[in-house]
Amino acid sequence: MPRSLKKGVFVDDHLLEKVLELNAKGEKRLIKTWSRRSTIVPEMVGHTIAVYNGKQHVPVYITENMVGHKLGEFAPTRTYRGHGKEAKATKKK
């Protein structure tokens, strides 16, 4: 079920404060965050946010197309290495 419009989007306060502070200064530097649940808002466009995937921080450059999505969508947590290969049969004489 979608979130109510009267509530607005969710962005962690500490992350939004950092973005607004950088916008006021006119700086564009890497912002580290563990908040995968935060929604991308228009104020974040042009920034690079390092989103934690459980192992490392994955740098994500925010574009206009990403607005409305969650930060966690762009930092995959699982690495798929393919299905297991069948063991080669040994040749017997």
Curated annotation (Swiss-Prot):
* Keywords, alphabetical: Ribonucleoprotein, Ribosomal protein, RNA-binding, rRNA-binding
Single GO MF descriptor? structural constituent of ribosome
Q: Which domain of life is it from?
A: Bacteria
What is an annotated GO biological process for this record, any one? ribosomal small subunit assembly
Which GO terms of the cellular component aspect does the record hold?
Answer: cytoplasm; small ribosomal subunit
InterPro entries, sorted: Ribosomal_uS19 (IPR002222), Ribosomal_uS19_bac-type (IPR005732), Ribosomal_uS19_CS (IPR020934), Ribosomal_uS19_SF (IPR023575)
What Gene3D superfamilies does this protein's entry cite?
30s Ribosomal Protein S19, Chain A
Where are the bilayer-spanning segments? none
Pfam families recorded: Ribosomal_S19 (PF00203)
Task: Specify whether Repressor is a keyword of the entry.
Answer: no
Chain's role:
Located at the top of the head of the 30S subunit, extending towards the 50S subunit, which it may contact in the 70S complex. Contacts several RNA helices of the 16S rRNA.
The UniProt subunit note reads as follows:
Part of the 30S ribosomal subunit. Forms a loose dimer with protein S13.
Q: Which family does it belong to?
A: Belongs to the universal ribosomal protein uS19 family.
Q: Could you identify this protein by its name?
A: Small ribosomal subunit protein uS19
User: From which source organism is this entry?
Assistant: Thermus thermophilus (strain ATCC 27634 / DSM 579 / HB8)
